[in-house]
Amino acid sequence: MNRSVKEKDAFRVMVVGDSISHGREGDWTWRYRIWQWFEQEGVWVDFVGPYAGTSSPDKPHPPRPPWLIDESPEPPPPLRTDGGYAKDVAPRFLANSNHFAAGGRQACQAKDVIAEQVASHQPDLCLVQLGFNDLGWRVSGPVETLASMKHLVDRARSAKPDLKFAMADIPYRTDLPDREDLPVSTKIYNDLLARSVPYWSTAESPVALVRFCENYSCGGSNSDAAYDGLHPNALGEYQIARAFSHTLVSDFKLGRSALAIPDRIPPRPLPTPASIRAVSAPSGITITWDAVYGAFGYDLQHRFARESDWESTHVDSNRYDQRWLQKGQAVECRVRASGGDTLKSPWTKVASAVADPQTAPAPTNMVTRATPTGFAISWEPPPPPYAGEIDRYGIAHFDSDQPGAVLCTVGVRGQSAEITGLTPGHRYYIAMETWTTAGGGIPAAARAVVVGRGTPPAAPTSVRAQAVTRLAVELTWAGMPAAAGYDIWVRDRRGVLRSLALCPSRERVVRVSDGSLSGGSMMKAVIPNMRPSVWEWEYAVEAYNGDNQSKLSEWVTPPPEAPESPEDMSLADTDSIHIALNHG
């Protein structure tokens, strides 16, 4: 078809959406399925927009050091829009696949850029699929998201007053831990949108609702239409296109009948990755393999040689760097391509390598102090030998009181730093690693902090000891709001002190569970291997916030009566401490 003739005479359509509409490399996409429907219905359309492809996969790269905190903010990664489609899409579609959809896009972002795109591409009709990211990422609630969609319509009209809109509601996602709010917010938003859309139309610029949600087989425990609980698989692509086609037929008189979903949905090709290799590298062991076209990443399993159990991880590119290894450790690994939660290729053969890392150990003498909005930390450089010069240190912190929190790491130079912008009252776990030209070394933990509570907490109270077996004792005490953690101390009858450690670092502290900020929480620690018996020792508890420590609690001993529990209780033969919370 002659492009100039097509541009002049065709009905111009722009898809405005997020990753659901953008698609990933190897997808057919619902945009292709509705293009096929237009072709079958004899509707001559020209898809317009700034992009033409899907989202291309991540490129493999070695481990990158964390961004330096005193530099300009790390720029966002460039938008990837050059990914290919399924190998069997019609060549004519590849010349007519333009769109304005991008992974991660929110309605509150799209409303600020839509006028420019409409002015540039002059669509006659916008197929709008947005809003999930606003709710799913807690950017805004249902009312605010609805307002963003109305602003999008208004600003698009400012560039083309006669623009038509087919506006989709949002799908239910499969259930997520700690996100009971999401299906509730989804229903509220969809109800608001359905009631509002009729009032958004004008005589020359109609707006019609697309019932994406009710046509999409996803939500709760059902994921028939989605490969990951949200994004469409081959069936889901047909279902979304069908939902839009219903609206185009009924409200815009485009086409004669809605798209019919075929009985046989084409399978996604997913061969086993080829050429897996594992080699020793300065940072540990590097595993690579040939990329699989259309894979949504890879499942990788690894284990130390002669062990039977695999550890699993998911990677987005065809490379994985096994870090934090000791010299001489042999690692085995295997890989399979992933097409989502249920579609997997067969595993590769097992590859192996022996580590000879050249990285530096973690810094020493780390000292932390809570501040009103974060924490301050100081340290000393690690002792040699190690390869190369120290380039920077990585400071990692994790908010244990925020559901869904992720580990954040920033780069620093020197021997001290202050991290700000954290949530007062929340507990943060902290660790550091050293970066040289060889890469990042094995991290070590510093003392955790409760932000905004910098003074040393009071001594723990209500400390009690109870024999569990002849060699194991259970300690309980009242949890403290200002404590980030606790030291457990014991002394023998001669008064010789001993600190019990959970972590193999300078931190002697038992890391407490979430929820212990409540002053009414009771802490519990089980201490095994108190030889020759638990009655030969006295026990005390010390609270801390960073390196600010309380006084020791009173010393306690278990009652002298013999325990009823059997002496062969299943406790590890190490100085580990097991903490639990009893509420009430």
Show where each model-derived region lies.
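Active-site segments of SGNH/GDSL-like serine hydrolases
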Residues: L127-G136, V153-I188, R211
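Catalytic His-Asp segment of secreted/periplasmic serine-dependent ester chemistry enzymes
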Residues: Y172-P271
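Pro/Thr/Ser/Gly-rich low-complexity, intrinsically disordered linker/stalk tracts
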Residues: D251-G294, K327, T342-A387, P424, ...
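Hydrophobic core positions of the immunoglobulin-like beta-sandwich fold
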Residues: W289, Y320-R323, A417-T420, A465, ...
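Solvent-exposed loop/turn segments flanking beta-strands in beta-repeat/beta-sandwich domains
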Residues: D290-F304, P382-D401, G479-L500, E536
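Beta-strand-rich modules
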Residues: Q322-L343, I419-G441, I527-S550
